[in-house]
Amino acid sequence: MHRTTRIKITELNPHLMCVLCGGYFIDATTIIECLHSFCKTCIVRYLETSKYCPICDVQVHKTRPLLNIRSDKTLQDIVYKLVPGLFKNEMKRRRDFYAAHPSADAANGSNEDRGEVADEDKRIITDDEIISLSIEFFDQNRLDRKINKDKEKSKEEVNDKRYLRCPAAMTVMHLRKFLRSKMDIPNTFQIDVMYEEEPLKDYYTLMDIAYIYTWRRNGPLPLKYRVRPTCKRMKISHQRDGLTNTGELESDSGSDKANSPAGGIPSTSSCLPSPSTPVQSPHPQFPHISSTMNGTSSSPSGNHQSSFANRPRKSSVNGSSATSSG
């Protein structure tokens, strides 16, 4: 699972700013021929003297370039949601303009054009905004009963719900810590904050939750929580204990091997013969000749030599024959 990376707004600025005025998009407008976007007033003023895109020089239209530009509401909503305070400042500028110029014709414009749209109506949330939320214990059994029975809320369900007012920038991790300290939940239990039946990430802010789940401000943001044992941590601790014990056993056996006479010899079974297997000579044609290892002569034990004790042995050494008896 890939870790989520949070990036700075400055890294997105090239995609959110108009190259003509150097500011963030206001009334974002896109050229349909090349899909480059600009502020509406900026591109309209530019196309009065040119018929080419100011970025890629593609021809917008031969005679009437304004026919090939479109308002981009989606891009403008993204800019308003990403740039803190931009929407509120723009609405204030428009209200101040029409207050200073009463003769300006704004009758055909929308409420947003006149600056009369509040943040709540546009569903724009700022970091310093206070969000009302409700949080209650998530009970699967109660949820099943609620599906099977009537949807009337009992007094017990109402009393289990708590209401909070928190900054929009507060994260789920902060809410989890608050619940743990408020209810004295030990660290051996895990707290999950949920929206409906879906657990939320620790790095989610209340503003993120409101945007992701399209909170309409028609009531407190409904959140739930559940408490469960930290099974994964317990398993990891057991595995570590097992590895530690195994390491201790191996170290103990290693120390025993170091103190034993065979400590310097590898313990691999494929390298050494078993006690019941006779030691094979490196010279199969002369099984009685001992082999030399590390400058010392190693010969079979007395039990293996007894079968050759009374048998004469003849071997050729340096071209001369030698006969030896047991």
Curated annotation (Swiss-Prot):
Q: Report the locations given in the UniProt record.
A: Nucleus; Cytoplasm
Put simply, this protein is called Polycomb complex protein BMI-1
Q: Where is the composition biased (Low complexity)?
A: 266-278, 290-303, 315-326
**Per the UniProt entry, what species is this protein from, by scientific name?**
Bos taurus (Bovine)
Assembly state and interactors? Component of a PRC1-like complex. Identified in a PRC1-like HPRC-H complex with CBX2, CBX4, CBX8, PHC1, PHC2, PHC3 RING1 and RNF2. Interacts with RNF2/RING2. Interacts with RING1. Part of a complex that contains RNF2, UB2D3 and BMI1, where RNF2 and BMI1 form a tight heterodimer, and UB2D3 interacts only with RNF2. The complex composed of RNF2, UB2D3 and BMI1 binds nucleosomes, and has activity only with nucleosomal histone H2A. Interacts with CBX7 and CBX8. Interacts with SPOP. Part of a complex consisting of BMI1, CUL3 and SPOP. Interacts with E4F1. Interacts with PHC2.
Stretch list, region Interaction with PHC2: 162-182
Pfam families attached to this UniProt entry: RAWUL, zf-C3HC4_2
GO molecular function terms listed in the Swiss-Prot or TrEMBL record: promoter-specific chromatin binding; RING-like zinc finger domain binding; ubiquitin-protein transferase activator activity; zinc ion binding
Chief place of localization: nucleus
Q: Which UniProt keywords apply?
A: Chromatin regulator, Cytoplasm, Metal-binding, Nucleus, Proto-oncogene, Repressor, Transcription, Transcription regulation, Ubl conjugation, Zinc, Zinc-finger
> SMART domains under this entry?
RING (SM00184)
Highest taxon, organism lineage:
Eukaryota
Disordered: annotated segments: 236-326
Role, per record? Component of a Polycomb group (PcG) multiprotein PRC1-like complex, a complex class required to maintain the transcriptionally repressive state of many genes, including Hox genes, throughout development. PcG PRC1 complex acts via chromatin remodeling and modification of histones; it mediates monoubiquitination of histone H2A 'Lys-119', rendering chromatin heritably changed in its expressibility. The complex composed of RNF2, UB2D3 and BMI1 binds nucleosomes, and has activity only with nucleosomal histone H2A.
Q: Does the keyword Nucleus apply?
A: yes
An annotated GO cellular component of this protein is: cytosol
Annotated zinc fingers (RING-type), start-end: 18-57
UniProt's post-translational modification comment states: May be polyubiquitinated; which does not lead to proteasomal degradation. Monoubiquitinated.
**The UniProt record lists the keyword Cytoplasm:** yes
UniProt-annotated stretches for the region Interaction with E4F1:
164-228
| Expression triggers | Down-regulated by oxidative stress.
Q: Name one GO biological process term.
A: rostrocaudal neural tube patterning
Q: Where is this motif: Nuclear localization signal?
A: 81-95
